[in-house]
Amino acid sequence: MKRNFLNYKLLTGIALSMGLMTACSSDDSTNEDPTDPEVPAVDSRWITVAGAKMGTNPGDGNGGTYIYSINSEDAKDPTVSIDPFENGFIAPSNRTARLQSSEDGSTIFNISYAGDTGGNYTKYDVQGGNTFQQLGTDVNISQYVGTAPRWVKLFDGDQTGAAVYVNVAEPTIDDNGTPDDISDDTYVRTDATIGVVTLDLENSLIKNFEEHSVPLSAEEEANGYYFSRIDMPTLNAAGDKLYIGGRLSKVDPTTTESDSDYTILGSKTIVLDYPSLLNPTVITSAVGHGNTNGYRSINAFEYNGSVYQANQSDPEGSHILKIDANNQYDDSYDFNLDDALNVNGAYILAWRPASNGKAVVAYRHDDSVEGVAGAQGFFALVDLNAKTAQKIDAIPYDPDFYLFQYQGFVVDGTEIYLTQGAVGENGNIYIVETETGEVTKGAELVNIEGSHFIGVF
């Protein structure tokens, strides 16, 4: 019989009495000391499932974001059934909320996306089920980065978040001293001004804000290239540089009209001093081409002293790129997902490594079936050290399994939790043991028409 979790007050009380979700097995008949090393201890944490409700079209996620939490033991139990859309907490956001969580899963951070409340930061204490208790006051950052900010939590012990935006100006034209003769005009460049704000997650305060005009090389700018989108700030291992992924667009210098048929340049990252957010520079990969801004999931992670970054829209298929401690791309590190998975046009939609350098990657490729909301997605187990990848066949796939909006994985030791479920269909939590590749089918996720699950936190 499936256990339906409709009210978590009882479980919350039990969890609190255990002391921050740490449970020790005991036997009343023997009066064993739960601190005895011979008594096995079971550590647990909250797993928060997020679902994006349909707005107008299946899979658009514009009907709101619903979250619901269970402990990790129940997340691994396929007899448990939860219904986030019927019983969940609505994360404040006009469109799909941009969620982050603390490393231990006890806190959810949210910045509302678009609408009247766009740019509003809130954080919540996770108490189980649909109980999320707001902590502190709201902070609105829209005056710094607009009402639809792109933001992530930096990996600095849950202390800081960083949000970014880019403002693209009209092309700069030199009239060469003859303002009435447009035939003599010369295209100069398209200026892109970036803004970066850092947010104190602990005290709900603005820490810093800076704006910069970030130029490309003279040749690239003369040919019409400019940064059109930035996202996914990431700290280096030393904590003194902030890397920001970027997407380039292009205008035709002869007409200043948008140019969609152009050579894709080497993948680029903007580097700022941290925490000052000053002295912007741009680094370029000679291995990967295309974008490094990702979409809705964190796109770059520090591991073993370097930052590993996914790219998208690469003509040779997505790569995982490496930025070393010298804050430059390591072009000796060549990890191409097309080659590793034996597919064409691999596109990394979201990914997350564990501390052992093994990661779960959500991806699509050129032969993905077109489903009700977009191209079918898959999961792969990746080894950053060996530069290998293998599709996780133990997870079921469906033509309507849509991962483009996927946001969150939970890392617990060497285990990675994820959600599976086609648009409008029930699914499950799955847990991947990255050391062995073993996959555990966990709790059932109950869906509603046109909606989909966007991860766990």
What would you call each of these model-derived segments?
Residues 76-89, 130-144, 193, 198-222, ...:
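Beta-propeller fold detector
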Residues 52-61, 165-192, 240-266, 312-314, ...:
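Short, conserved, GDST-rich strand-edge loop motifs in beta-rich repeat architectures
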Residues 208-372:
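Acidic, serine/threonine- and glycine-rich low-complexity intrinsically disordered segments
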